[in-house]
Amino acid sequence: MKPSVATLLATVSLVYAQTATEKEPSLSAIESAAASIQPYSPVSNVEGVAFNRFFQVWLENIDYEDAAADENMKWLASQGILLTNFYAVTHPSEPNYCAAVGGDTFGMDNDNFNQIPANVSTVADLLDTKNIAWGEYQEHLPYPGFQGFNYSNQETYVNDYVRKHNPLVLYDSVTKNSTRLRQIKNFTSFEDDLANKKLPQWAFITPNMTNDAHDTNITFGAKWERSWIAPLLNNSYFMNDTLILLTFDEDGTYSKSNKIFSVLLGGAIPDELKGTQDDTFYTHYSVIASVSANWGLPSLGRWDCGANILEIVANKTGYVNYDVDTTNLRLNETYPGPMSAGEYSKYSPVWPNALTRGDCSAGHGILDIVKETYANTEPTYNYSSPFPYDTASNYNTKVTATKKNVTGTHRSSSSSSPSASSNAAVSAVAPAAGVSGLLLGLALNLL
């Protein structure tokens, strides 16, 4: 029996009882919520062209060279494919997490209590188009869907869980849906889901502030990561057709270009590719594009649209990636936007319009709700570019890219960075949605 709209509205409205707070909630409030909110672990079995499960694990703030020199990182790389040309997209941490699921930084240049409007889509919306189960696992999250700014270690009171390292909780399209919130869980839920064979097909995994190297160092973080991932590499359920990305949010030296050490692992990698390296240019946006290409999903119409696709996927779909000349590439800051606090970019009240036309690198067009939201508008940026740039703020305008040919070498006639004329400055904010309308929409979607 389908529940009534009234029942669904009541269920959806539970999210408002979990008030987002810009400081750490009291322990009593946390314990009260933890006693009543249960994790939700949907499962699915949608076959992809290169993998059937994708998990990514993020560590923090380490320069590429320092990670590459660590013995545990060397061991991890020997088990899979080392990505030698993978870049974060800005500084500091939070905008990279934001970009990894939403395809844009929206000018974010800070680790504040940022909230992205409910009509801005995420990778969760892409996965939902084919009912592909997704989830997050945040170490020491006190309960599913916790929206507080942080949660300290209750014994030592050191930093533990922090909101800025939780990508989907930044988006109101997730936090205003109680079911989606319950898919944001902790490591205890990961162990339960693993044991019960209820892991999702897509997951984002964040260790706590000690294990992710943020408050420690690469030696500590790499040792933790190897000890955590090594047993999973011997778990047949976990490994079967699984692709794992081990990466970092950003490098540790803000004056550098923001290249980060990244490794692909898992049963989806052919034996002959283990211990090899891939020199293709990638960013955090490439991960969204690769997930879309693998499962035949649409694009968000943002920087995921033109992003290079992981070669392990591109070789299956036939997509030809770009070679990007990184000589003049600077991904250590971002362009103006509504999430800027004036730290590494300039504030602008204008929410960028998404792209609504084109196949994108994944080859499956744009998400329908994005096309509806931004109908009859021009994209603010040239989101079909394999790297982010903005002519208005002179951001990465000297970077060039050339399509590879089928053998992976350059074509004889090189192409420069995509036309600046596509980078239109359009003053249009993200359309607003009333709370009642949003709740009704969520309810009707569940019917």
UniProtKB/Swiss-Prot annotation:
Glycosylation sites: 119, 150, 177, 186, 208, 217, 234, 240, 315, 332, 382, 405
One GO term of the biological process aspect: cell wall organization
Catalysed reactions, as listed in the record: a phosphate monoester + H2O = an alcohol + phosphate
Pfam family, one: Phosphoesterase
Alphabetical UniProt keywords: Cell membrane, Cell wall biogenesis/degradation, Glycoprotein, GPI-anchor, Hydrolase, Lipoprotein, Membrane, Signal
Molecular-function GO term, any one: acid phosphatase activity
Gene Ontology cellular-component annotations: plasma membrane; side of membrane
Expression triggers: Repressed by phosphate.
Domain of life of the organism encoding this protein: Eukaryota
Residue positions of the active site: 215
pH dependence, entry free text: Optimum pH is 4-6. Active from pH 3 to 7.
Disulfide bridge partners, by residue number: none
EC number: 3.1.3.2
InterPro entries, per the entry: Alkaline_phosphatase_core_sf (IPR017850), Phosphoesterase (IPR007312)
PTM notes: The GPI-like anchor contains a phosphoceramide lipid group. The anchor position has not been determined.
UniProt membrane topology term: Lipid-anchor; GPI-anchor
GPI-like-anchor amidated serine: lipidated positions: 419
Chief localisation class: membrane
PANTHER family for the chain: ACID PHOSPHATASE PHOA (AFU_ORTHOLOGUE AFUA_1G03570), NON-SPECIFIC PHOSPHOLIPASE C4-RELATED
Physiological role: Has both phosphomonoesterase and phosphodiesterase activity. Cleaves a broad range of phosphate esters.
Protein name stated in the entry: Acid phosphatase
Organism of origin: Aspergillus fumigatus (strain ATCC MYA-4609 / CBS 101355 / FGSC A1100 / Af293)
